[in-house]
Amino acid sequence: MAAIVWKGFISFGLVSFPVRLNAAARPETIHFHMLHKKDESRVKEVWYCADENKPIDRAEIVKGYEVRKGEYVVIEDEDLKKIAPPTATTMDILQFVKSDQVDPIYFESSYYVGAEEGGGKAYALFVAALDATKEDAIAKLSMHNREHIVLIRASDNALVLHTLYYPNELHKANRSETPKTKYTAKELELAQSLVSQLTAPFKPQEFHDEYRENVEHLIEQKRKGGKITAVKQPRKAPVIDLMEALKRSVKAAESKRKKPAGKRKAA
């Protein structure tokens, strides 16, 4: 069974029911070990005390917050448990919003919400209510040593929860503005036509991580002592004639749509 990252209650009005959270996704990355270049042996991480000038055991380490240079306040795990707010065990629904109202830029992490024993009926009713009203629930939840704003929505006859960034966590200063420039009505028409030609249902199973596949191939080739061939990177020249580039793009998209899609060969 998948690891449970949180257990508690969802509460709205006078109704509450027990739930659990499981991580909905995790990146499928390839992990490399750190090796000593000289003999390719594993390198170990050592915790080192700067004052005593010697290695120490992990059990001797505590958390500390620096209040001024070189002065720390030690914070124990028990201290954090004592100050945990009610949202550490109960998600109180604060409001409901239309499903398209929250900008996806606020989405942080996703979790599956499962019903715990005794909460099946209320869970099913909550899913049905969200489905029928096309609304999502906004609540607060404490886990991983912080309090999150969360969005709970119905998906495939179950509940999914997304933690959200707080407004101050968004780096709005990094946002780019659209350049002030002019384009013709014909250029806009061609751009819209290109969008229409490339519009298709989203099928995530059709996408794959080419970089990961290349790394796996690289590892296998080096294991066999084979030659490593560099992947050719496309060199795109700056667009000089935007109208002509749009026309050619639309034509290429039309041709691609007419051609039957071939099955992708298995790796």
Swiss-Prot record:
One GO term of the biological process aspect: double-strand break repair via nonhomologous end joining
CDD domains assigned to the protein according to its UniProt record, in alphabetical order: KU_like
Family the entry assigns: Belongs to the prokaryotic Ku family.
Keyword set, alphabetical order: DNA damage, DNA recombination, DNA repair, DNA-binding
Domain of life: Bacteria
Keyword DNA-binding: yes
Function noted in UniProt: With LigD forms a non-homologous end joining (NHEJ) DNA repair enzyme, which repairs dsDNA breaks with reduced fidelity. Binds linear dsDNA with 5'- and 3'- overhangs but not closed circular dsDNA nor ssDNA. Recruits and stimulates the ligase activity of LigD.
Full protein name: Non-homologous end joining protein Ku
Subunit structure: Homodimer. Interacts with LigD.
Gene encoding the protein: ku
Residue span, Ku domain: 10-190
Gene Ontology terms for molecular function: double-stranded DNA binding
SMART domains, per the entry: Ku78
